[in-house]
């Protein structure tokens, strides 16, 4: 809501800075909590519902902008965009109260008033036994960075984050505003791009449900988004002056949003038998790594000055998509290798730090692998 009172760009920058600090735990924290409650055959759908709800907010936001612009622009001498932030803030307040009072935490420490003692016991029995809480120390950090989990999943999400660039950087909207031959209205600029998150919602729920049904084969989404990135970019490069191609490809690119639910569910699945603290670090690092790269990637390849064709960005998308397919294959190989080791050693959950070497069987590098 404070954005509604902003008078200069620096005000918005300061507000966004503090907003990022306070909301940084929301996305990864929710995926961590979901991974604490649900099994491999359930997690995808729950993660999908969570991420799809965010996409629904983006889609509905476009229609809200159109309505506010047409009915409230100038009301009480405030521009429509200021009313938008006021209304968004009012919508958010009850959600914050709801989360503060009813967020369930994890099965072993939940105080949710809507769960009975028997339901809490059932929740605990459904998920693997975890080790004692490991204190944050140099030993723990060394353990985190000596596992393949951290490197492979962080890079996976960095690549995945950039395959979302068409949608996350609003390229369709920028294309409409900078169309070489046609002038689109404000309503059209707001409404037409809502098809992108709509496709994202359908794709997210489809892939989340399918990978659950197939026993957690989340890697399929990695190949899907790789194919999507290559084909959509190639067709836009081949037909730069076709409005139909641009609309179709940008809508199709919205399906890449499916990686949010499935890749974080994938990390939760693979780390299910490791320490919760390690799982938390890996999941948080995935999002941190993606944001760190995206901070300059978007400017370098998808800046507004490259509109309407974003030729440089199309080539970048093809390169990232090829890398995504290769990295997905490598991660699958590491996952299968780790699962075979667990079967041989009989390790089904992580042991306590310092009480044995078994905890490193699942995720640690051999000396040869470090090289």
Regions found by a protein language model. Give the residues of each.
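Flexible cytoplasmic loops linking transmembrane helices in multi-pass membrane transporters
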Residues: 104, 112-174, 178-184, 282, ...
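Helix-breaking motifs and short loop linkers at transmembrane-helix boundaries and internal kinks
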Residues: 4-11, 22, 38-39, 215, ...
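Hydrophobic core of transmembrane alpha-helices in multi-pass small-molecule transporters
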Residues: 11-25, 33, 244-262, 266, ...
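A gly/Pro-rich, aromatic-decorated transmembrane alpha-helix motif that marks the paired
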Residues: 28, 50-75, 93, 97, ...
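Cytoplasmic helix-loop-helix junction between adjacent transmembrane helices
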Residues: 15-52, 68
């Amino acid at each position: 809501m404070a954005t509604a009172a902003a008078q200069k760009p620096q005000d918005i920058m300061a507000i966004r800075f503090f907003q990022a600090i306070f909301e940084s735990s929301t996305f990864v924290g929710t995926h961590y909590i979901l991974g604490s409650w649900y099994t491999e055959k359930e997690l995808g759908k729950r993660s999908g519902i969570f991420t799809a709800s965010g996409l629904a907010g983006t889609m509905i936001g476009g229609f809200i902008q159109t309505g506010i612009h047409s009915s409230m622009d100038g009301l009480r001498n405030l521009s429509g965009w200021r009313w938008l932030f006021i209304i968004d803030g009012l919508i958010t307040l009850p959600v914050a109260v709801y989360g503060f009072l009813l967020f369930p935490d994890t099965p072993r420490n939940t105080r949710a008033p809507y769960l009975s003692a028997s339901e809490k016991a059932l929740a605990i029995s459904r998920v693997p036994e975890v080790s004692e809480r490991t204190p944050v120390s140099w030993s723990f950090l060394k353990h985190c960075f000596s596992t393949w989990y951290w490197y492979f999943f962080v890079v996976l999400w960095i690549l995945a984050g950039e395959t979302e660039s068409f949608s996350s950087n609003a390229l369709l909207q920028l294309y409409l505003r900078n169309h070489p031959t046609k002038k689109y209205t404000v309503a059209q600029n707001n409404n037409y791009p809502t098809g992108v998150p709509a496709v994202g919602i359908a794709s997210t729920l489809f892939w989340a449900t399918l990978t659950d049904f197939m026993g957690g084969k989340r890697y399929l989404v990695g190949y899907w988004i790789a194919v999507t990135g290559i084909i959509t970019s190639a067709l836009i490069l081949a037909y730069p002056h076709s409005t139909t191609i641009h609309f179709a490809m940008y809508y199709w690119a919205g399906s890449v949003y499916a990686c949010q639910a499935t890749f974080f569910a994938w990390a939760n699945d693979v780390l299910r038998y490791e320490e919760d603290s390690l799982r938390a670090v890996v999941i948080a690092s995935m999002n941190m790594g993606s944001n760190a790269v995206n901070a300059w990637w978007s400017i370098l390849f998808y800046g507004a000055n490259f509109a309407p064709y974003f030729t440089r960005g199309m080539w970048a998308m093809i390169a990232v998509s090829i890398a995504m397919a290769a990295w997905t294959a490598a991660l699958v190989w590491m996952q299968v290798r780790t699962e075979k080791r667990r079967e041989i050693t009989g390790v089904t959950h992580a042991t306590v730090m310092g009480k044995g070497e078994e905890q490193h069987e699942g995720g640690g590098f051999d000396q040869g692998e470090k090289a």
